[in-house]
């Protein structure tokens, strides 16, 4: 399921979209470093949470952000005073209109050296949820949908692919995000 006109492997891109993507790719590493310098002083260590959301056909829910290239598991930062579960519930609702109806299962906590030397991500497996509809595109999420694990979009991140593989193939988690 995709938003109309946004297939995961679209080869045609309008010139304005190509220019925005080129600019984003050029500035993305610097922006990431700048944000992590801020977070270092504001928070010391950063914690994130992501969900491997699987429907009854074992299709996995992925999101495509407006500010970073590729497809990812839904999730985000854990706020001060917030539990991992509460952060997961908030992020799933914000990014996918997904409401937890059962308890998510912790898959693992991973060191994400790609983001910074202080970043850790808790990954949960979510099989019991409710979603009334896909969300409309917004300033954070450009597209989202459920995908067969054997037919993920080409630009799905390496860490996302690894987590999906671990969950669906019952593999032991690798300690780093990648």
Predicted features and spans:
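Short, well-ordered beta-strand micro-motif
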Residues: 53, 123-127, 146
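Conserved Nudix-box catalytic region and its N-terminal flanking loop in Nudix hydrolases
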Residues: 55-95, 177
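Active-site-adjacent beta-strand/loop module that shapes the phosphate/pyrophosphate-binding cleft
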Residues: 110-133, 160, 167-171
């Amino acid at each position: 399921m995709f938003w109309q006109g946004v297939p995961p492997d679209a080869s045609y891109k309008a010139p304005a979209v190509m220019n925005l993507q080129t600019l984003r790719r050029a500035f993305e590493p610097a922006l990431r470093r700048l944000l992590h310098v801020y977070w270092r002083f504001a928070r010391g260590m950063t914690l994130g949470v992501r969900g491997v959301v699987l429907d009854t056909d074992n299709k996995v829910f992925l999101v495509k952000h407006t500010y970073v290239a590729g497809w990812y598991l839904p999730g985000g930062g854990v706020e001060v005073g917030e539990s991992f579960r509460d952060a997961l519930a908030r992020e799933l609702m914000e990014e996918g209109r997904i409401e937890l109806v059962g308890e998510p299962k912790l898959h693992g906590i991973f060191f994400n050296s790609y983001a910074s030397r202080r970043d850790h991500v808790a990954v949960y497996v979510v099989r019991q949820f409710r979603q009334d509809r896909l969300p409309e595109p917004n300033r954070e999420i450009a597209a989202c949908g459920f995908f067969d694990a054997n037919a993920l979009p080409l630009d799905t991140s390496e860490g996302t692919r690894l987590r999906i593989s671990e969950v669906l193939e019952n593999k032991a988690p690798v300690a780093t995000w990648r």
